[in-house]
Regions:
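Glycine-rich phosphate-binding loop of ATP-dependent small-molecule kinases
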Residues: 1-214
Length: 214
């Protein structure tokens, strides 16, 4: 990953090409349906806890903007509300782990979304004796998901948010493929639910209350 592609929430000096993952790092996972405000909350979490934000959406958008073969394939799937193949996403995630230093941990946003991805993440971290620290799941009702995404589409003119059919497909995809992860992480006592209804500050406070425990 090149320094010019880093997020504004951390400087390029934190990124170095290497093959070493520092021990005792924190690995947080942020869950939530589309429209739950994950992007806003992720920014606050990264800044407060000195984390490297790994967003599969951002990684894929970079490929799409570059017009790569992966980007073109991903664009077609995303526009239909479908998920990108696991092996592609997993490779990008592991690559991110290997290029970052100078932070206290990682915040994964948009990964894992399925049980196979969760198992793959465990396997990736196990290579260096690491494990997921905790998962934070922002919960909002389906009706609110639809309302928020449609409102965002009107303000930003986002083509992928303009169709109710696509929005419904994204909601169904989230429930069918992502929610089984609840049981997976509950079994190891790493699942934490956050009420996503309220102001940004209220939701943020609930998230910080959980993360402060680690």
């Amino acid at each position: 990953m090149n320094s010019d592609a880093t997020s504004k929430t951390y400087t390029s000096s934190t990124l170095k090409q290497n093959n070493h993952i520092t021990k005792d790092m924190k690995y947080y996972i942020l869950f939530g349906p589309p429209g739950a405000g994950k992007g806003t909350q992720a920014t606050a979490m990264v800044e407060k806890y000195n984390l490297h934000h790994i967003s599969t959406g951002a990684l894929l958008r970079k490929e799409i903007a570059a017009g790569t073969e992966l980007g073109l394939q991903a664009k077609a799937l995303i526009e239909k509300g479908c998920l990108v193949p696991d092996e592609v996403v997993e490779g990008m995630i592991e690559s991110e782990f290997k290029t970052v230093t100078g932070v206290d941990g990682f915040l994964l946003d948009g990964f894992p979304r399925t049980l196979p991805q969760a198992e793959a993440l465990d396997a990736i971290l196990a290579k260096t004796g690491e494990a997921v620290t905790a998962t934070v799941s922002i919960l909002i009702p389906d009706a609110m998901i639809m309302e928020r995404i449609k409102g965002r589409a009107l303000k930003e003119g986002r083509a992928d948010d303009a169709s109710e059919d696509i929005i419904n497909n994204r909601i169904v995809t989230y429930h069918n493929q992502t929610e089984p992860l609840i049981e997976y992480y509950e079994k190891v006592e790493k699942y934490h639910e956050i009420d996503g209804i309220g102001t940004i500050e209220e939701v943020q406070g609930r998230i910080f209350d959980v993360m402060d425990k680690f």
